[in-house]
Amino acid sequence: MKIAVLLGGISRERPISLKSGENVLKALKKLGHDVVPIDVDENFLEIAPKLKEFEVVFNALHGHFGEDGTVQAILDWVGVSYTGSKVLASAICFDKVMTYRVLDGYVNFPEYTIVKKPVKESPYGFPCVIKPRKEGSSIGVHICDNSNQLYNDLSEELKKYNEMMIQRYIEGRELTVSILEIGKPQILPVLELKPKRRFYDYTAKYVSGMTEFILPAPLSVEEYQKVANSSLRAFELCGCEGFARVDGILKDNVFYVLELNTIPGLTDLSDMPASAKAAGMSFEELVDAIIQTAVR
């Protein structure tokens, strides 16, 4: 099969996308496919029509432009099959506020408010969490313990973003749930994350040895059902397709969804490949399964 792999991109997650894309390229070549890498830049719209010559496009982009529905809209315009969720689901899941609006009343998530200028008070007390409304890889996320830290961190981040979220801090077990459509959406073994830092931030995600993976997460039957049901519900409500990852916190038998990732990382340290491995899937088998979701 002739497959194009989109990688790199123009977001702050470019370094991670390059790693994901390189791993996907290697896997597809091992599987015997004719593979062409495409490093996406601002001129993507000009070259996009050439993608018609490919049977499938594997989208390994992360962050703005590649994961927010923009590239998906271009690929739909070209008329080529591609991996992952389509335009609407991608746009919803990349915008945490829109994600929560869709999930409201169906799935638990931490309370939040939006600010467009620095403030010193949190509606939820301290510690609290601040994060960009639209961003990935925990970029721009801070846990603030007092008024001064809240004000200073917001001041810094609002130089980069038009608005920020202040969210209730929930101290619990960090879980990530990888979902793969094999006929229907199925949950891979739930992964519990134990970062050596305060939370699963950019460094904990991408520096080897900074996070302990516990697979499968030790959950009671009741806990597993709540985590699984909430994750599948979120996947379906947001209209996700192919594959995705649901990140959340388990506390007092309640699973709080933090976000949905429509293009999960596929680096050597990423969560979804680890969960797939725990399910008995090699990385090549995972990539092949993702490709199959695009050609069905």
Curated annotation (Swiss-Prot):
Subcellular location: Cytoplasm
Keyword Ligase: yes
Position of the signal peptide: none
Enzyme class: ligase
Co-factor binding comment: Binds 2 magnesium or manganese ions per subunit.
Pathway(s) served: Cell wall biogenesis; peptidoglycan biosynthesis
Domain of life, source organism: Bacteria
Binding site for ATP: 125-176
GO molecular function, one term: metal ion binding
GO biological process: cell wall organization; peptidoglycan biosynthetic process; regulation of cell shape
Keywords attached to this entry: ATP-binding, Cell shape, Cell wall biogenesis/degradation, Cytoplasm, Ligase, Magnesium, Manganese, Metal-binding, Nucleotide-binding, Peptidoglycan synthesis
Function comment: Cell wall formation.
Assigned protein family: Belongs to the D-alanine--D-alanine ligase family.
Name of the featured protein: D-alanine--D-alanine ligase
Organism listed in the record: Pseudothermotoga lettingae (strain ATCC BAA-301 / DSM 14385 / NBRC 107922 / TMO)
